[in-house]
Design a protein with these regions (language model features):
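Glycine-rich, proline-tolerant flexible connector loops at the mouths of alpha/beta enzymes
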Residues: 31-57, 112-120
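N-terminal amphipathic alpha-helix/helix-capping segment at the start of soluble metabolic enzymes
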Residues: 1-3, 62-63
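Glycine-/proline-rich flexible loop or hinge segments
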Residues: 39-45, 73-81
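Short polar catalytic/cofactor-binding loops
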Residues: 7-15
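Hydrophobic faces of well-ordered beta-strands that scaffold small-molecule active sites
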Residues: 2-7, 30-32, 69-74, 108-110, ...
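Residues that cap or flank secondary-structure elements
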Residues: 9-10, 50, 88, 133
Length: 155
C-alpha cells in the first residue's frame, strides 16, 4: 500500500522543498495543487503557466524524490453563471489534463461546483437543476480527459 499526502500540507516554500519533505515524512505519492506549492502560480493564468518546461521540471523533481503524482488539483467552478469565466475555466481544465499527463499524474481532481459566481455552497447546489448543469458542463472536460488518457476525479 502507498500512503500519500496533499503536497501543500507539507512544509516548504516551493515544489522541491514540499517534495523533499513528503519523502522525508515517508510518503510515496502526492496530490499537487500547483497554486499552493509553486510560488507565483495563479490558477487564472494556468493555461499559460503549465508549460512543457514546467512539466519537465516537475516530473524531474517527482523522480528525484521518488514520488508519484496521484492527483493534480483543478478545483474551479464548472457551474458558474459567468459564461466568460466558464470559457476560461474550460481552458484551465484542458491545460491541467495535458500537464497532468506530462508529469505522470493518474488523474485531475475537481468538484461539482456551485451555481453562483462566488463558488459558495448554497441550497441550490443540491438541486436537480444544478446536477444537470454540472453534467452538461463537465462533458467536454471528460472528453479531453479521455483524449489525454487521464481520469477526472469528481468530489
Amino acid at each position: 500500500m502507498e500512503i500519500g499526502i496533499r503536497l501543500h500540507d507539507t512544509a516548504g516554500s516551493n515544489l522541491e522543498e514540499h517534495l523533499r519533505n513528503a519523502k522525508e515524512q515517508g510518503f510515496s505519492c502526492v496530490h499537487i495543487a500547483m497554486s499552493k506549492v509553486v510560488p507565483g502560480f495563479k490558477m487564472a493564468d494556468a493555461p499559460e503557466l503549465l508549460t512543457d518546461a514546467l512539466a519537465d521540471e516537475a516530473r524531474g523533481l517527482l523522480e528525484k524524490y521518488n514520488q508519484r503524482c496521484v492527483l493534480l488539483g483543478c478545483y474551479l467552478n464548472l457551474c458558474s453563471p459567468d459564461l466568460s469565466a466558464h470559457e476560461r475555466t474550460l481552458m484551465n481544465y484542458r491545460a491541467h489534463l495535458r500537464f497532468g499527463k506530462k508529469i505522470g499524474a493518474l488523474m485531475v481532481g475537481t468538484e461539482t461546483g456551485a451555481p453562483n459566481i462566488g463558488y459558495k455552497s448554497c441550497p441550490e447546489c443540491r438541486t436537480e437543476e444544478s446536477l444537470r448543469l454540472f453534467i452538461e458542463r463537465v462533458k467536454p472536460v471528460v472528453r479531453w480527459a479521455e483524449e489525454e488518457g487521464m481520469m477526472l476525479a469528481i468530489e
